[in-house]
Structure formats: structure tokens, C-alpha cells
Amino acid sequence: MNVLLMGPPGAGKGTQAEMLVSRFAIPHISTGDMFRAAIKNETELGRKAKAFMDAGQLVPDEVTIGIVRERLAQDDCRQGFLLDGFPRTVPQADALEETLKELGLELDAVIDIHVPRERLIERLTGRRICRQCGATYHVLFNPPPTEGLCGKCGGELYQRSDDSRETAENRLDVYTRQTQPLIEYYEAKGRYKRIDGEQDMAAVFKDICAALGRDAE
């Protein structure tokens, strides 16, 4: 089962990735993890990637693709994998297709967890942190006993600047610009599956498994 998992910030993609990896015993392959491993192991591509990152530059596609290829060629991917955070552009998707073909693999499905924009903004802007003890709350999912006050120490709760509505809007705008061409790309290949991410975690997971033709339990 070779799956690409997509979803905007706030869609719960990380949670679903953990559940899929646990249920089907496949490796979770994220771009960040791949870069960190390649740099730690001091592979040739890892050294190249580190040089660009240290200079504050984007890592070129050819280096990224090379690191992805090295990871997908490892033995633990022969029985399936969950790809997360790559590809981000159509040229990267084309390169991934070619890489998978060379390795005798192919994507079985592209799962996109969809949540309406306003709901995503509610999720992204709902975090509150205690100024005194650092406890974290969420106004929707884990509200404090008393609004604005920490339930542990009574300290004042505040919203971090990177949890503001403006920041959330910008993050979602960037994501939409990046991924819309990818959605059309995978729709044309007949692999795209859109999942309703407004449901509870278990229902979302069940729908993902159904889209993959697998049992959730």
C-alpha cells in the first residue's frame, strides 16, 4: 500500500498519518525526516542539502528527489509506505512518478483530507498558552475551565502571534496555491481521493481506510 497523504494546516493530517502507520505497519516518510536523516548520516546528498539550508536557500528539486529516491529504495518500503510533505509541485510529482517507476513501485492512492477554510482557521487560531506555567489549551478541543485563565495555576492565557488569524490565512493561501495544481494532476491520473476531515478522528480514519480498500480495524 503506497499512499501519498495531503491536507492543509489544521486538517489533522499528522494524527491520521500516525494512525495509518500504526494500523498497517508501513514507514511514515516525511520530507523533514528524510532531510534530517540524510544530513545526520552525512550522505553526499545530505551534505548538499545542508549547504543550501545553512545558506538559507531552498534545496533544489534534484537534491530533494535524490534524497526521496534513497529513502524509497530502502527495504522497509517494499511492503508499502506513507509519503507526507512531498511532492509539493507538479514537476516534483513528475519526478516522483519517474523515481517510483525506476524502483518498480507506484502510488496506489493520493488521500486529501479536506476541511472548509473557516473551520481550519478556527482550529489554527484556537490555541491558548498560559503565561505563567506554559500549559496549552485550545478553545475548541481543550478549553480551560474558566475562559482566559489557566486551570492549573490560574495564570493568564494568551494567543501567540503565529496563531493569529492573519498568519492562518497566509498559511492556507500558500497551501492552496501550491496544492491545487497537484490535485488536478492526481485527479487526471485517477488516484485522487478526497476525505471529509470535519468528522471526528475515528470517522476520518475509517473513510481513509475505505478509500484504500482496507479495514480500519
From Swiss-Prot:
Region called NMP, residue ranges: 30-59
Places the protein is found: Cytoplasm
Binding site for AMP: T31, R36, Q57, L58, V59, G85, F86, P87, R88, Q92, R160, R171
InterPro entries: Adenyl_kin_sub (IPR006259), Adenylat/UMP-CMP_kin (IPR000850), Adenylat_kinase_CS (IPR033690), Adenylate_kinase_lid-dom (IPR007862), P-loop_NTPase (IPR027417)
GO MF terms, alphabetically ordered: adenylate kinase activity; ATP binding; zinc ion binding
Sequence positions that bind ATP: G10, A11, G12, K13, G14, T15, R127, T136, Y137, Q199
E.C. designation(s): 2.7.4.3
Residues covered by region (LID): 126-163
Catalyzed chemical reaction(s): AMP + ATP = 2 ADP
GO BP of this protein: AMP salvage
Pathway: Purine metabolism; AMP biosynthesis via salvage pathway; AMP from ADP: step 1/1
Highest taxon of source: Bacteria
Record Gene3D superfamilies: P-loop containing nucleotide triphosphate hydrolases (3.40.50.300)
Record keywords, A-Z: ATP-binding, Cytoplasm, Kinase, Metal-binding, Nucleotide biosynthesis, Nucleotide-binding, Transferase, Zinc
GO cellular component terms, A-Z: cytoplasm
A Pfam family assignment: ADK_lid
The protein's assembly and partners: Monomer.
Record comment regarding domains: Consists of three domains, a large central CORE domain and two small peripheral domains, NMPbind and LID, which undergo movements during catalysis. The LID domain closes over the site of phosphoryl transfer upon ATP binding. Assembling and dissambling the active center during each catalytic cycle provides an effective means to prevent ATP hydrolysis. Some bacteria have evolved a zinc-coordinating structure that stabilizes the LID domain.
Xref: PANTHER family: NUCLEOTIDE KINASE
UniProt similarity note: Belongs to the adenylate kinase family.
Function: Catalyzes the reversible transfer of the terminal phosphate group between ATP and AMP. Plays an important role in cellular energy homeostasis and in adenine nucleotide metabolism.
Record-given protein name: Adenylate kinase
Species the sequence originates in: Heliobacterium modesticaldum (strain ATCC 51547 / Ice1)
